[in-house]
Structure formats: structure tokens, C-alpha cells
Amino acid sequence: MESSKVILYPSPGIGHLVSMVELGKLIHTHHPSLSVIILVLPATYETGSTTTYINTVSTTTPFITFHHLPVIPLPPDSSSEFIDLAFDIPQLYNPVVYNTLVAISETSTIKAVILDFFVNAAFQISKSLDLPTYYFFTSGASGLCAFLHLPTIYKTYSGNFKDLDTFINIPGVPPIHSSDMPTVLFDKESNSYKNFVKTSNNMAKSSGVIANSFLQLEERAAQTLRDGKSITDGPSPPIYLIGPLIASGNQVDHNENECLKWLNTQPSKSVVFLCFGSQGVFKKEQLKEIAVGLERSGQRFLWVVRKPPSDGGKEFGLDDVLPEGFVARTKEKGLVVKNWAPQPAILGHESVGGFVSHCGWNSSLEAVVFGVPMVAWPLYAEQKMNRVYLVEEIKVALWLRMSADGFVSAEAVEETVRQLMDGRRVRERILEMSTKAKAAVEDGGSSRVDFFKLTESWTHK
């Protein structure tokens, strides 16, 4: 008998890959007859290494197979812009993906192909093979409202976002100031803007869009999507909110990891955790402001510091990038670690009471699940939009004062960290959402119901 397969196709980069792997685990857990193949694009631009993560998943999760696509040299006239490459590279790989899907189809039944939105180019391939094709939107329902509304925004607003200085009205979400739109969309005639619009149009024609969120977290956005109000000039695709999908922190040894050992010695809910994602780096001037603000706040802290961009490839020391004597002066109350920390395990630790975050959606969901209130410090991509949702709509984060170019003063860090750790409103709200997040993925919960609606056609053919 032919085996049944679900094909997942993420874009390069650890953030999108982790979400896809968690989706693969969910599919197999509830439908053991379905095995999962993840197509892996070579990282031809800097996305953060995925090798260790893939090796770990391969060892612990045998029902997920990683199929590494061969390296194809980039044409000499390729764009040097990251966002253009993110769309152009999948286009380059379409012939390889076509042959791969045909080869898999010879020995297995492909029940579904699930695409990351950056690999939109593959939509024409899977549809040409008459395969049910879905998009996995790694952000939330509010972000999906904005994304599906992009073609309408394109027609409605004549100027570029960078020049508008106005609020963009999007059904289902609070008004978004034009300066808070992703910078890759600032120029409506740019390749990146046009690629996002193409992807949005293809999403509307797909078998469905899967989003990593849950109904109770984003009720207004979810209702807008289900009512078809995000797309104004055609039918809307089925929407499936199946989250929260997050990596668990259970695989980290609390007695071996430096961060967790230190947290074990701290009082309950006393530590503010600062971490800014795999691509979140600051210049030395900003690192020093954060350090001064933390020290003045008097709060306990665990801070992940990445190498400043000006330091090139050389190794760096904390004393080289932080104020003189800072690490020594704060060692009783704080721990600074370089480059990486086990974020889900830290957010799930009893001692952590606050999170200064870049507003990446995976990180935001982890904070919601573990009930840790946030300070919103967006850095890139759609994170400024996420800040609006998290602060104004969902009310689980605090706004952080920053200059027009994104610089944050020591005073703003001190003030907002204190407000976060001493305040009750946001803490109570996120604890309420944490309870609802857990209920959503239990039997009969909203996300579980959506998930079985999604997979029903895959298992009854």
C-alpha cells in the first residue's frame, strides 16, 4: 500500500523552520498514518544556522524526513537585497522542487503541500501537479489580516508608505501607522512589495491558510478573516488557526545550562529576560544604554547579548561592548550571556517575570503560553506591526519609547522595565491568555477543532 505524505516547504532560517517542524509534529501526533517530508533550501544568505537544530530533530523525530535540495549557484545578476533573494531563490529551485514532488508521488500519495509564504514561487508547481496546496503563515491572525489586505492597500493608497505619514486602515486590526509597516513595503513599486502582493493573491486561491495563533488571542482578526473581509475583490480561502505551535523547553537540562542553573537560585517572578531573536543585534552605543538602564532599574535580569555588527567575524568579550565594570557590578542581580540562550525553557521558568522582546511572533507566542508579560522592542520585518497588535489589541505588552531611528535611551529602559515588573494589568491579562492558549489545544479547543477540519480531507480519501 502506498504511504501518505505531507510535504512542508519552509523558507531558509531558523524561525520559519521551527514553526514548520512543530506543525509536522502536530500532524503526525494526531494522524500517525501521515509522515512528513520537509524540503530544505540551502541558505544562500545569512539566516542563522539550522544545522544543529535539523540534526537534533532528525535524531528525535524519525517520522519527519528532511530532504535537502541541492545547491544551485545564484545567477551573476542576482539581487543583493535579502528580501528579494528570499523570493527569488525559491523561483530558481522550482524545477528541482517539481522533480522532487514527482519522484515522491511515484512511491507515495501526497495528501498536501504546505508552503511558507516566502516560497510562493512553488505554488504554480504544486498546483500544476494537482496537489492540495496550503500556505503556513508563521505569524498571527492580525498579521494575516494585513497580508491578505495588501492587494487592496496597493490599489487604495497612491503614495509610498515611507512618504505617507498616515494611518493605514486594515479590517480586523487597529490602525497601523505607515511608518510601522515593514520597511520592505515602503516603496510600492519595489520588487519586494510586488512579491508580497503576488503571494497574497495566491494565498486567496489556495486550499487554505494555516496561521500560528488561536481564536481567543485574536478574536476580532479571526472573525474578520472568517467573514472574508480581508479580501475585497474575490473569495477568501479557508483559514485555520491551529496554534500556539511553539518548541518546548523540555529538552534542556536545568542542571547543566548556565542560564537555568542561575535562574534556579532566583526568587519567583523576579527576573526580566532580554532576548531579541536570531537576527537581533545592536550597536555598542545601544548596548551601553540598555546596560545603564538595567542597572538603574534595580531589577534582576538575564540578558542575551549578540555580537555588534561592527565587530565583524572576530570573537567578542562582554567587557568590550558593555560599560566598564558592568558585569562585575551587577553579578549579584544579573547574568549576561553571549549569543544564545534556551528561550522556551527560560520563559517557562518560575523565576522569570518579564520579557523584553523583539516582537517576533514565535517569541511572542512563547511568552503568551508561559504567561510572561512583555516590553515590545521591534527591530525588523513585521515586528512593528506585531507591537501594535500586542500592545493595543491583545494588551499583553508595554510600549517602549524610542526615537524615530529606533534608538532607546537608558531612561526609557529603566522606566519601562520597572513598569513591567511592578505592574499588574498586563501581567493579569497575559495570565488569562496563557490559560486560554492551553485550552485551545486541548480536545474540543478551538485550535484542535480547526486542525481536524484542516486534516479531515487528507485522511478520508
Curated annotation (Swiss-Prot):
Listed Pfam families: UDPGT
Signal peptide: none
Residues bound to UDP-alpha-D-glucose: 278, 340-341, 358-366, 380-383
Domain of life (superkingdom): Eukaryota
EC number: 2.4.1.-
Gene Ontology molecular function, alphabetical: UDP-glucosyltransferase activity
InterPro entries to which the protein is assigned, alphabetical: UDP-glycosyltransf_plant, UDP_glucos_trans, UDP_glycos_trans_CS
Keywords associated with the record: Glycosyltransferase, Transferase
PANTHER family: GLYCOSYLTRANSFERASE, ISOFLAVONE 7-O-GLUCOSYLTRANSFERASE
Role according to the record: May glycosylate diterpenes or flavonols in leaves.
Family (UniProt): Belongs to the UDP-glycosyltransferase family.
Name of protein: UDP-glycosyltransferase 88B1
Source organism: Stevia rebaudiana (Stevia)
